[in-house]
Regions:
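Metal/cofactor-centered catalytic core regions of large enzymes
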Residues: 1-125
Length: 125
């Protein structure tokens, strides 16, 4: 399994690690010559027990235990009043994600660890 890490500080990418794939992705973002391409646009947590990985982002971003990360441009409609300027936008799906928010782990390899969220997800796990 290939592992890449996108480390964020505030809304801007601080570090992209993970070997060859991460280096290629970082070079792709740098090729736009736009700092906006290193800004977080959105994150979605996959909590749909019926979703499966199909190659269609509309379903893929909902796969249980995944996270979907958007980087770059955000329209003014989605982030009023001005949006987030960038030359492009890209999304990436991470399966079996581990997530920390403000130093607290809420997901570990796709399993919910936060007590409140775990109670909400009891039917699934």
């Amino acid at each position: 399994m290939r592992r890449s890490v996108l480390q964020l500080k505030t809304v801007k990418s601080k570090k992209i690690e993970g070997g060859r794939d991460a280096a290629i992705f970082e070079e792709h973002l740098k090729s736009f010559e736009d700092e906006g391409m290193f800004k977080l646009a959105h994150i979605a947590y996959g909590f749909n027990p019926g979703a499966v990985l199909t190659g269609n982002i509309v379903e893929d971003e909902r796969v249980w235990g995944s996270t979907e990360w958007g980087i770059g441009y955000v329209s003014p409609f989605d982030a009023p009043p001005h949006g987030q300027d960038a030359k492009s936008h890209c999304d990436g799906i991470c399966l079996n994600s581990s997530v920390w928010l403000d130093g607290v782990q809420i997901m570990d390899e796709g399993r919910i660890t936060d007590p409140y969220l775990k109670e909400l997800a009891a039917f699934r796990e």
